[in-house]
Amino acid sequence: MEPRRAAPRLPSQASSSVGAGSAAELVYHLAGALGTELQGLARRFGPDAAAGLVPLVVRALELLEKAAVGPAPDSLQVSAQQAEVELRRLREENQRLRQELGSGPQEERALLRQLKEVTDRQRDELRAHNRDLQRRSQETEALQEQLQRLLLINSELRHKLAAVQTQLRAAQDRERERQIAQDGSSQLAKEQSLEPDAATSDDPVDTQKQPGNLPEAVQCGFSREELKQILQERNELKANVFLLKEELAYFQRELLTDHRVPGLLLEAMKVAVKKQRRKIKAKMLGTPEEAESSEDEDGSWLLLSNDKEDVPLVPESRIQNFFGLWYRGETEAPEAETSNPASSSLQKGEETPQQPHLQPVNSPPAPNS
């Protein structure tokens, strides 16, 4: 390869080169002087006297040499390229950061909008549930009022029915007595027709004495219109009872088939209806109210126990695992205890019978008209 030809230098370049050459000469002169001094110290006091100082002096002189001579043209070009690459990288990073800074508020606004929509929807659902619960509570109150009204009407019906039965029984007795009296009078008339004419003069006295009770029986009996009125009232009361029973059964079906009714409220309503049925039955039959059995009490809380089993358990602490030497025996014992109640609860679940469905309140059988 041919040696590069030196390009003509400008005056400024020449002056700078002269200054650089003089600075380099000064550095070299300083290095020679320091070298001779250090060698003299080493000859006088031994080589170990300046062993720690020599590397530092050499490093400082090399730095002064580089600064005095200046970088080569190739190194300047490489450093300029590196600076351009670094500048381009910094510009790209700055642009990316600006884009992220501009897109950050938009994403936050979108997230806030979504959160607001979710909260509004949940608020609407809660309001709908509250309205539904209020409506259900109003329906249960109306059902309780209808039950009370049914009890009152049932008691009035029982009193009226007892009065009608006594009246009908008395009327039947009077009708029977009247029929007996009519049969006796007809029999006496036949006997009088068969007897001779001589005995006819004595018979009217006896006939007047015997049928003398007929007008009293006739006066004490009910007329046909009164009996019709009594039977009509009884039929109307039976119709009212039937309508109330149908309405009560409708409300019971609505409450039992609705899946949105909470299980606790439904179970409480079942227990209340069972109590009302026992009260109505005791009032209708005139017997003392039956005491609640243990099966009913256990069945009423069966739903609560199932709900508690569905609740997730609190996770146990794992700190004791780090002290396994001391807590190993205690952790094995609860595991055995938890496995045993699980099997016992399964056996109890298989043995518990299913609860019967509720039926509408029974009414007393009315006598046939």
Curated annotation (Swiss-Prot):
One of its GO terms (molecular function) is protein dimerization activity. Residues 251-312 are annotated as: Necessary for interaction with RAB7A and RAB34 and lysosomal distribution and morphology. Residues 337-361 have a biased composition (Polar residues). Residues 219-295 form the RH2 domain. PROSITE patterns: RH1, RH2. Residues 173-219, 332-369 are annotated as: Disordered. InterPro entries: DZIP_RILPL, RH1, RH2, RILP_dimer. Residues 10-100 form the RH1 domain. The modification Phosphothreonine is found at T287. Keywords: Coiled coil, Cytoplasmic vesicle, Endosome, Lysosome, Membrane, Phosphoprotein, Protein transport, Transport. The modification Phosphoserine is found at S293, S294. Residues 74-177 form a coiled coil. It is found in: Late endosome membrane; Lysosome membrane; Cytoplasmic vesicle, Phagosome membrane. SUPFAM superfamilies: RILP dimerisation region. Rab effector playing a role in late endocytic transport to degradative compartments. Involved in the regulation of lysosomal morphology and distribution. Induces recruitment of dynein-dynactin motor complexes to Rab7A-containing late endosome and lysosome compartments. Promotes centripetal migration of phagosomes and the fusion of phagosomes with the late endosomes and lysosomes. Homodimer. Interacts with RAB7A. Interacts with RAB34. Identified in a complex with MREG and DCTN1; interacts directly with MREG. Interacts with CLN3. Interacts with FLCN; the interaction is direct and promotes association between RILP and RAB34. This is Rab-interacting lysosomal protein. It comes from Mus musculus.
